[in-house]
Regions:
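Conserved phosphotransfer microenvironments
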Residues: 57-75
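Acidic, metal-coordinating helix/loop segments flanking the phosphotransfer/catalytic sites
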Residues: 36-54
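Conserved phosphotransfer cores of two-component systems
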Residues: 48-50, 73-79, 90
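Conserved acidic carboxylate
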Residues: 13
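Two-component/phosphorelay signaling modules centered on CheY-like receiver
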Residues: 16-35
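A Lys-centered signature of the CheY-like receiver
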Residues: 104
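Hydrophobic/aromatic residues positioned on beta-strands within the core alpha/beta folds
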Residues: 84-85
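Non-catalytic signal-transmission and effector/linker regions of two-component phosphorelay proteins
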Residues: 1-8, 41, 107-126
């Protein structure tokens, strides 16, 4: 599977097992993985330093943080992202509106499709 070949994808996930699984899914699809970032601070630094092509975020991070500030920065830089979460889409803050919500658990094919949908959504923005 090479659906993501050549793409550099930032992973923002504080759970080690989830991060490892996500990295494996992305690598098997041909992506180069950046991260994982476990905190907002790490994620913001990686966005500035690495300029990823796309990103996959978890909603809840370490120390009670959420990834909303990360989503805002990705939107400012026109970087498409997927919010992979167990939180219901209708209860998410508006800061995630530019991304695509993918409900956990999900299959690799659903992740790849969501990343494509995120790209289409971001490029369609005015």
């Amino acid at each position: 599977m090479s659906a993501l070949r050549g793409l550099r994808i930032l992973v923002v996930e504080n759970d080690e097992m989830n991060a490892t699984l996500l990295e494996l899914q992305l690598a098997q699809a041909g992506a180069a993985v950046i991260g994982p970032a476990e905190s907002v601070r790490q994620a913001l630094a990686l966005i500035e330093q690495e300029r990823p092509d796309r990103a996959v975020l978890d909603f809840r991070l370490a120390a009670g943080e959420t990834s909303e500030a990360v989503a805002r920065m990705l939107t400012e830089h026109a970087i498409p992202y997927v919010l992979a979460t167990g939180v219901a889409a209708e209860s998410l803050p508006p800061g995630f509106a530019a991304g695509v919500v993918l409900t956990k658990p999900y299959l690799s094919e659903q992740l790849i499709k969501a990343l494509g949908d995120a790209h289409a959504k971001m490029t369609a923005r005015p």
